[in-house]
Amino acid sequence: GVTTWWTTYVGRVMGQGLGGASTCLLVATGGAIVSYIPVGQMASKIGRKKTIQGGVVLLAACFASAYFLTTHYQSINAVMFVVFALVGLAWAAINVNSLPMVVEMCKGSDIGKFTGYYYTFSMAAQVVTPILAGTLLKHISYSMLFPYAAFFVACSFVTMCFVRHGDCKVEAK
């Protein structure tokens, strides 16, 4: 939802153009790229589940911060770039470890089936949430984008608390 609606949000809520909005998304992507390998290494030390949960907490905090920043400032600023870089880090912590957890839960012959489940539900969420978020933004307020995102990210933390399988064996210290 955030990626889909961000450029419209910046125009409606902040009165800004596409340049700053696009730069924020570029910074988030850069933050993710530089984080992929380190979060994979971190997961081998503390576990995938804890790494994902840390990413989820950071992402929710970033979305809450983005709400505050975008509703209290009329222009994109350096603090927003830092927040978006952290969004990239958080997203990397979640993404790098999610599919490996699914694969760890199944037997070798079931990897394709479980990968199919993973991508089906992941892609379905990516189709549904922009529609749901768009309806909310249209009928309530565009300023609801980040509270909406933070809420559903927090819900994902709750679901991760119930995950019992698929974690890696943590390296000995």
Question: Where in this protein do the model-derived segments appear?
Answer:
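Multi-pass alpha-helical transporter architecture, strongest
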Residues: 147-173
